[in-house]
Design a protein with these regions (language model features):
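Conserved catalytic or regulatory cores that recognize and/or transform ribose-phosphate-containing ligands
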Residues: 2-168
Length: 168
């Protein structure tokens, strides 16, 4: 095979990107711990990249000088909503157009927020696989979220062999 054909074939394959969805606003450490662990695993075992909204939010906070944005919720609600809207728009664009599948940690922390619900729904609407790690009693899991999920797992240890089989 000549070099031109090899380069074309090599560049034709793009790295898959997973969106790591889950609670941030009401979660300890904004949910960064499980996302860091899964990011390493996906890279090491599948060569997949991730979109980590915790990291992206930190970049947006810096870009827009919003280090104290959480205080704005009560002190300046309009400013708070404007900044959150920037984050929401970025996340919507990313789920729809920049990622290949979504991994979601569904626990009690997501129940007070709205972003995770929206991300799961957007991924479903965009025909992207949604792999849900359910940490609440099945009786309490929303039928909507169940319907939007491609497959539901009890823990990350159950998800990993499935991903290996599907993507390796």
């Amino acid at each position: 095979m000549d070099m031109d054909k090899w380069i074309f074939i090599k560049t034709k394959f793009e790295t898959m990107i997973a969106y790591l969805s889950g609670a941030m606003e009401f979660a300890d450490d904004e949910g960064s711990g499980w996302r860091k662990d899964l990011t390493k695993w996906l890279d090491l075992n599948l060569g997949h990249n991730v979109y980590d909204p915790v990291i992206q939010s930190a970049e947006l906070i810096k870009k827009y000088g919003a280090s104290d944005y959480r205080n704005w919720k009560e002190s300046d609600p309009k400013r708070y909503a404007e900044f959150i809207r920037i984050c929401v728009d970025y996340d919507i664009e990313t789920v729809r157009n920049r990622t290949d599948y979504l991994i979601c940690l569904w626990d009690n922390n997501v129940l007070k927020g709205a972003g995770t619900h929206a991300e799961v729904t957007l991924a479903y609407e965009s025909n992207k696989p949604v792999f849900l790690i359910n940490k609440i009693p099945k009786a309490d899991l929303s039928g909507w979220i169940m319907a939007c999920s491609t497959k539901i797992f009890n823990d990350f240890d159950s998800l990993k062999p499935y991903l290996l089989d599907k993507y390796r």
